[in-house]
C-alpha cells in the first residue's frame, strides 16, 4: 500500500494542467474514478467535474481545483520522490520545475477519500488560479445535500481557513467538531479560493480550506512534504468520520460597504508592485502612503495585503534575489 500510494502521487504530479488546459488532469480523474463501483460522474459546460458516491440523504464533500500556475514544464519533466519530499525536475535542462502541487495535493486527498468512503461528493473546478472561473459558474444545486465542504488548497501544514476577505466560511459548531487542534492545525484567515466563490453564490453550509503540505506554491521550487500531506489527509478523514450532521452557515461580511472588494484588490495590486521593487516598507508605511488614495481601507486591511504578499513571496526569496543581484 505505501508503494502504491507513492506511485499514485508521482503519476498525478507528472500531469501538466495549466489554467484553461486542464483536460489531461480531467481525463486522469475520469479514468481513475470510473473504476470505482457506485460512482456517478458529471461534467458541466465549463469543464468542472462533479462526483457522487453512494446514495444518502446527506454527504461529506471535498473540492479542489484542476489547474496550476507554472508555465515551465519540459518534455522530460518528472516528479522526484524522496523519503520526505516530492519535487519536479528536468534532467535535460538540469533544473527544478514546479509540481503544480497547488492543488494536485488536494486532488490526491479527494481521490484517496473517494476510494475509502461509501458516501462522498467531490467537485473539481477549472481555472481557479486565474480568478475562480470554474467555481464562479459551479452548479450550486450539487451541494444542496452536502453536510459541509472541505477544500485542501493551502500551503504549509497547520492552517484551517475560516474567513476570506471579511467573509466567514463556517459555523463555530463545525469548527469545534473538526477537532483540528488535535492535528496541529490553527484557525486563520486566507486568500481567494473556490470555497469563497461558492459562498458568494449562496452556499449555505460550512466550508474550510486546509493546509495540505505544499510549499513555495506558484514557483519552480515548489515541493510537497509528504508527512504534511498525510497530516492533512488524516484531518480530512477525521472530519468525514466524525462530522455526520449538516452544518448550516450563512456568510457574514462584517461591517464592510459594497465596493470595498474592488478597492482592496486595486490597493493590493499597487502594493504588490511596490514590494516587488523594494521590500523596505512596513505596514504603517503602506497605510500612510496609500490612505489618501484608498480612504475606505483601514490598518487591518493593509496588514492583510502585507501578509498576503509575504505568504506568496516569502522573505527568504527576496533575500536570495538580493544576494544574486
Enumerate the predicted regions with their spans.
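Active-site metal-coordination/substrate-binding segment of hydrolases
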Residues: 52, 56-119, 129
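Short secondary-structure junctions
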Residues: 35-43, 81, 85, 181-187
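A non-catalytic alpha/beta surface segment that caps or lines the substrate-entry region
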Residues: 15-58
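Acidic/histidine-rich catalytic neighborhood of metal-dependent amide-processing enzymes
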Residues: 94-173, 182-183, 187, 194-195
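Single conserved hydrophobic/aromatic residue that forms the stacking wall/gate
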Residues: 1-7, 11
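Zn-dependent metallopeptidase/amidohydrolase metal-coordination segment
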Residues: 186-232
